Amino acid sequence: MAVFTHITKEDLKDFLKNYSFNNLDFIKGINEGIQNTNYKVGIDSNDYILTIYENITDTNDINFFLELMIHLSSNNIKCPTPVKNLENKSIGRIKSKSSALLTFLEGKSISSIEESHTYEIGKALAEMHLNVTNFKLEKKNDLSYNGWSDLIELNQKKLNFLEENLYNKLKKELNRIRDLWPKDLPSGIIHADLFPDNVLFLNNKVSGLIDFYFSCNDFFAYDLSICINAWCFNKENKFSKEIFRSLLKGYQELKPLTDSELENLPVLCSGSALRFLLTRVDNWNSSNEVDIVNYQDPKEFLSRLKFHEQINNIEDYGL
């Protein structure tokens, strides 16, 4: 989340005329993140999040994300709920951009990850996967392995600046991943971006999953592999077998992994590490950021990709 589009109280009051509210109490920009403009707003003594969509221009995509949140909320998954306006729509417009008002969730992201946290993350991810089976909308994964080759070609100079001959190394690694990529695993809607900054904790329990704007259809185990890359490496980029085991324990208590999912987890982890390496390189020095925006270092995912290259089976992770 970030602030790209500046709005005033008067702008927001005009936006809120299409809602059944009375008083606008405050408006405060949120600087974290890189995708959308976000404000915390107080209305009628309650807190909300106003999201202004910067990079997502297709209203069908926005509607998919918002309907997914409505579906998950109705199935007791802790996530923001879009507020419908007087026209019974979740999408409005402010400063000529698609926007949505979402309920505010209490809690904070954690910076020091412990086994108890990843156990809760595993359970939360499994709960989400179990509750999307009857969600009727679909969205293909625009950042699946079919698109990684284009990102490698597009960012050749950046990759070789990051590390000598990295462009050719990643082309070779992508071929390895493609050869091993599974054809048929349990699948459905995944979060696809469940990093620590997208999970809120309150009293050491998950109080909310946020930022569903990469959600799409893909393998459930691929979603789990993203969590492994996001949660199971410490600040020195060292893999923690204990954190890994607690993540899988929480997940499998609610949704046991199939033998095929376990067998393919190493290549899925390689794939998700490559995906985030490439998108971080693509975002690296390539945006005209307006305010304070947290661009992320691609090097940490290069290190994680190299780690997964050495993994031969699930036991090598310490399971």
Q: Where are the regions a protein language model picked out?
A:
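ATP/Mg2+ or Mg2+-diphosphate-binding catalytic cores
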Residues: 276-319
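ATP-binding pocket architecture of kinase catalytic cores
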Residues: 43-137
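All-alpha amphipathic helical-bundle segments outside canonical DNA-binding/catalytic cores
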Residues: 257-269
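A glycine-centered beta->alpha junction motif in the catalytic cores
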Residues: 99-112, 153-156, 276-291
